[in-house]
Structures are given as structure tokens and as C-alpha cells.
Amino acid sequence: MRAKRTDRIGEKSINSYGTEMIIIEYCNEKEIYVEFQDEYKAIVKTRYWIFKQGSVANPYDKTVYNVGCLGLMSNGEKPITKVNGVHDFRYVTWHGMIERCYGERSLKLKPTYKDAEVCDRWLVYANFLEDLPLIEGYELYINSKRGDYIVLDKDIKGNGAKLYCVENCCFVTQSNNVKEIHYRQK
């Protein structure tokens, strides 16, 4: 005998990242709402069979180098990562920052980043997006033309700081960044 739809409310499962989820609303097999049982309590619409399979994606699971996640915007929407099938430039900036600090291959190529970290807030892409306009040089970054190379720097403003955060970071041209690196190495 099949369970009634109301009997499925409260049913628990674990997703592929090990996060517990609970059905909080069951409309039918094709429309259920689950709440993840972590500090964020994200609610996601999915299908019952996906829930049973454990394939429901939690926006706060650490899917980027085992430290970063996409999160949700303040309006509850997923942050934009691609536009017309191409990674959004803001996502590329965020992902590159995470990769420099936590990617094994990147750390082998550039061991100077071995002590660098990303602040807890910015490990969530949605938070990084929210803070972007607060970063010094944001206008340069957002208005750069194709061919301009604008980079996120933690050293210039942070006096050689090892932490990526809004207080330490600024956007600068690649050429100014290289000049600053040479100046600091003297």
C-alpha cells in the first residue's frame, strides 16, 4: 500500500554530500519541498524520487574545492553562475580566488598562496556577490572592456595580508598588480 502524501511530510533522507534533508511539504511525487538540516536550513523544491535517491543539491554543500558553495541570494534565489552557457565573470573571479587558496594543482604551481585564505563569508558565492559593490575599484571591475584585465588583489590594500575579505581587497589592473608585486619584493 502506498503512503498518503501527508504521510511523507517529515520523511528524512541524506543527500550525496551527507547532508540530512526532511520533507516539509508534499504536493505530489513531482513537487515536494525539502529543508536541509544544516546551519542555513535552505528549502529546495524537488521531486520525490530525487529525494529518495539522495540527489537533491543543497546550495550550501561545499562543492567548490571542498570549502566553497553557491548559497542563496537574499531573495532566496540561486546566484547566477552562467550567462548563455558561459561562466559569469563574477563567478570566474570568485572561483579563481577559491582555487588559488584551496586548489591542490594551483597551490603546486603558485606555492606563495599556501598561507592565503578566504574569509568564511566569501566561501559562499552569494555573499561574495552581495559584497562586490563594497570592494574598492568595483567600478573599474564592472565597467572593464573586453581585453582589459582587472584582478582581485588582497595584498595592496591589506599590506600583504593573506586573507581575502572586503576589508583587504581591491580591484586593480593586471599591470598595476604586477608593479605592486615587484615593489613589495624589493
Regions flagged by a language model, labelled:
Residues 80-103, 107-186:
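Short, cationic Gly/His-enriched loop motifs
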Residues 44-63, 166-168:
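Cysteine-rich micro-motifs
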